[in-house]
Every structure is written in C-alpha cells, then in structure tokens.
Amino acid sequence: EMNSTCMIEAKIEYDGNTRSFGIGLRQDNSFSNGYYLRFEPFYNRVVADMWPRCIQGVNQWYVDGDKPFMVELERPFDYRSLENNKVDIRVIADDTILCLYVNDSMALTMRVYNNERPFWGFFVNDGSIKVSDICMYHICKGENYV
C-alpha cells in the first residue's frame, strides 16, 4: 500500500509490439478508479491520466469521458533511443502531487484529487512487460531524503 508521501522506483522492459504500459497509483482495490502514468511507444509519448475522468452530468454534453487523456498531461518521449526497450522510472508522491521521472531525462507531474486510495501496481495493454528492481521508500514528513 502507498503512503501519502513515498517514492517508488522500478525498471520496466517492454516487448517491442506493446501498445501501452505503466503504473497505476492511488487506485481502489479493483484497479478501476485512480491515476495512471502510461507509456505509449507507438505515439512516442508518456501520459498522465485518471479514471473516471469526470463525473457525468445531467445532460449528455456534460460527459468528459470521451477524451483519450488530458492533453496538457502528455510529454514526448523517444522510445527509439532506449536500449533493449527498458525504462527506469521513479515516482515521487507527496500528498496531492505525483511526479514521474523517466531515465533521469524526462519529468511529468500531475495533481491528484484523491490521495486516500492506497493501492498501486503495474499494467500492460496488448503486449508484455517485465518489471524488476522494484523499491518503495516511505518518506516521513519533515525528514530530508535523497
């Protein structure tokens, strides 16, 4: 389970034909309600997303779930430069902030509006991944960390 303030590190190797993969954070126990940091090799991008995206309103035009993701939460990433389709990730969670670092060369930050859900895990869509060297560090408020 995730504390409100923690750091997660891992190495992810993906199959060359994988559509998308990533890490789900602040998830409910069914992994269907939370935040996702998603790698999309075909589109050469990394995306921060959440599900459900917004609450459905009274009228049909209030539905916001047909957007593929929040465009402002996308970063370009050149997957062709990777050696053996491997990425090193570091996620820092600090209450309502999630920050993803990829290979110490790219950062993506998002605000989370529900940091009480404690579950997290890795996922893949249409492909396969190997996750290794998984470490979670619990950070106590007021302490320095490196």
PLM segments and residue spans:
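Extracellular glycan-recognition regions
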Residues: 1-146
